[in-house]
């Protein structure tokens, strides 16, 4: 166990070194590699949170547009990805703050944030596969309103809400926000996934009401 953990740490360090000392330097015009590395460290601590460009800019002593440009560069190099809030008004949704996640969810230290990032990564891979395979156009968003009700993920199919996913570490009762947003979006399915709940052999995409399901069960039915 200790040997595997040590190997994991060594691999992460090597991968990070390659990203910042070679890929970022060679594939972009960014000169301040040290500051971008600091940004990456801050993003790893803020996974699953709204991106506050101004706050990040103040911490790193650069402009907000520079932070946005650097995050885009890190996204292009598959270090992180952002999710936009869903809105029927597409222009309006693009103005709002996105959420940030890492492609390598093992770099996230906080357990709850790491679990949410784990689900986000698998959902993103699934929608990319479905779209590339010609099943339709799929996108991944999150939901949040002015009353601060929130659901972690919304998958859309051809621009229409398809299913919601709320991620919980423990086996808890279904979040009221999941019921609320399913009613508001008219999504066909809604799931609250439990990371601790053991796998059960059941089909998730049948019942229309919100379901409490093991993460393993839902993820096994995506691709």
Regions found by a protein language model. Give the residues of each.
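Hydrophobic/aromatic beta-strand patches that form the interior of the parallel beta-sheet core
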Residues: 101, 141, 165, 189-193
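Arginine/glycine-rich "motif VI" loop of SF2 helicases in the C-terminal RecA-like domain
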Residues: 129-133, 180-188
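Active-site-adjacent loop/helix micro-motif of nuclease/hydrolase catalytic cores
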Residues: 170-179
């Amino acid at each position: 166990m200790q040997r595997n953990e040590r190997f994991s740490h060594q691999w992460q360090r090597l991968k990070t070194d390659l990203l910042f000392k070679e890929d970022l330097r060679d594939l972009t015009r960014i000169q301040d590699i040290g500051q971008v590395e600091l940004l990456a460290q801050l993003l790893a601590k803020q996974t699953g949170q709204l991106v506050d460009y101004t706050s990040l800019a103040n911490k790193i002593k650069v402009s907000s547009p520079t932070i946005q440009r650097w995050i885009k560069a890190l996204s292009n190099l598959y270090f992180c990805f952002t999710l936009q809030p869903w809105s029927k008004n597409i222009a309006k949704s693009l103005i709002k703050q996105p959420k940030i996640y890492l492609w390598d969810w093992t770099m996230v230290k906080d357990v709850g944030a790491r679990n949410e990032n784990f689900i986000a990564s698998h959902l993103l891979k699934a929608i990319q596969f479905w779209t590339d395979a010609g099943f339709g156009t799929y996108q991944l968003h999150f939901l949040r309103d002015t009353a601060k009700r929130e659901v972690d993920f919304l998958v859309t199919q051809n621009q229409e809400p398809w299913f919601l996913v709320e991620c919980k570490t423990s086996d808890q009762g279904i979040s009221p926000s999941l019921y609320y947003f399913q009613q508001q979006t008219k999504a066909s399915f809604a799931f609250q996934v439990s990371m601790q709940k053991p796998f059960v052999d059941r089909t998730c995409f049948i019942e229309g009401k919100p379901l409490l399901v093991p993460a393993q069960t839902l993820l096994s039915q995506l691709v």
